Amino acid sequence: AIVAKVDVKEVAERAGIPDIVRESTGELAGSAVDVLRRQIVAIDAIASGTAYRLTGRDPATRPTSPSGLEEETGAGRKGRGQVTGHYAGPLSRLSAFLIDTAIVWFSFLLTIAGIAFIVDVFSRGETPPATDLGPIGLAVLAVWAFLYMWASLTIAGRTLGMGIVGIRVVDRQGEPLSARQSLIRTVVFPFSFLIFGLGFLGIFISPERRTMHDAAAGSVVVYDWGDRTAEMPAPLTRWVSRRAEELATIDSE
């Protein structure tokens, strides 16, 4: 009888159990994403470091972040290197691009399908299929993609894909992009694909990992995981530390 009178919901709320569950769920989801992000950061470091070394330069001498941006260095949790504010590498940027491409396509097709359905209702089935874009449809898609990227960079400094991967676009001093810089970067972006994508070569060989559209807009891309520290795996962190010590020894001699 006593148990029946107990308000279990009220007791749980007073104990903070719902908050604990929400925080735990959020931490687990965030941890799963961060595991993938760390592996991407590791591949970034290996790929860009190898390419930089092929140009006759040591990756250890490469700048790590914009001059005006506060960066995190050294080993963090469990010996993982902290890379918040460091220049982002090729796989991070490619992953963000692929996610954004999917977002643009699906959101565009869903919108077109919705409009086509409404028109179809009033036109008695005389409209073409929603997937049959044609020249006008492709032009509208291009405008859709342009607005998505420009608005995202202007408002948040990153697109949805960049946010998922954990990167952000800033100017060369680490400050947020202006609307003008976001516009220039968005307009020039397609031209980086010309001549077999030579505009992206700078990600591998440029000290600041800048593409053609970055150079035009005066922008760079850095790691930013929001309220969590961007990290690289512990084994790679140890290797980087040993390499830095070797260079310091050589310089002292």
Model-identified regions with their sequence ranges:
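Amphipathic, rod-like alpha-helical scaffolds used for oligomerization/assembly
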Residues: A1-G79
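Voltage-sensor-like transmembrane helices and their cytoplasmic interface
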Residues: D7-E10, G16, M162-R168, A217
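Short, small/hydrophobic-residue-rich motifs at membrane-helix boundaries and re-entrant hairpins
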Residues: T25, E72-F193, Y223-E253
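Hydrophobic alpha-helical transmembrane segments and immediately flanking/interface helices
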Residues: F122, L201-D227
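Short helix-terminus and kink motifs of transmembrane alpha helices
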Residues: M149, L153-T154, R158, M162, ...
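Alpha-helical membrane-embedded segments
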Residues: F191-L201
